Amino acid sequence: MRVTRAVCLALSLLLLSALPAFASGVAFIINSGGASISLVDMSSLKEVRRIPVLREPHHCALAPDGRSLLVGDTVGNEVLFFDPLTAALQKRMPVADPYQLGFSPNGKFLVVNGLARNQVDVYDAASMQLLKRFPIASMPSHMDYAPDSSRVFVSLQGTDSMMAIDLNRLAVAWTAKIGKTPAGVLWHNGKVLVADMGTDYVVVVDPVDGRVTERIHTGKGAHNLFMSPDHKIIWVNNRIGGTTTSLDAATLTPIRSYAIAGGPDDIAFAPDGRLWVTRRFAEKVAVLDPKTGEYDTVDVGRSPHGLFLSPKGSAAASVAAR
């Protein structure tokens, strides 16, 4: 009898349904090229388990109540729900092309970007019912929200643009050209910051109308950006150049660049102050000490992309990469 990948996946996930909590905390590393999720012990920095998925996972998001970690499998067209403390599978839900996903600050909405299908879906976060689908010209990629959850800002890589969706009206507020192949998005101090891969800059955008007001050079292939837990530093991964740049959050002035070979992509922050950085082209994760510039290396699966850290004792304190 021929055993399909779907059957093997179901059996593997069944075995994961009753895992004990990880004593030292667990890191979820999403291997987009390996159709898997690596579970890494945060103390030993060793992979302790690998969870298969159907096709091609990329990003994850922690549910507002902190009880579920959602992982999107784009080609598999489903979202998997895991216990963030034990990695036990909770459920699976059909979702079209869930490349990037994120909950609004008020916990009311879940927005899912379908990069391949050129669509942005807005769900009711409580019921998981689709509220509206927005057809997009080309490649909706990353996102972030206004703090009051009134708008979500989505980078459109295929048209060098960004769009703002009014979540109260479920309507497009504006679409504007902002650079060349924009990717990561971050709300900061009343403005929207966008990592613009094609120009090697971080672009500052007015959230009211999409006007570009400033550009900050960070490095070749500026891909994604993340706010530090203390809100003092913005970290920018320059994927093509193999560097990670720190910006002063108050002035947006570059402070320092760190060499991290292998395509630094997403970042999560550990309680000990170190940064976990996925290295997209290297099958590895760098655990960077920002004080020394040195990093430890964690071997994971092929093309690691999104990640989530669940330290010992509190999943709610973890930071998931967008």
Where are these regions (language model features)?
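Predominantly soluble domains enriched in secretory-pathway, periplasmic, or organellar proteins
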Residues: 11-322
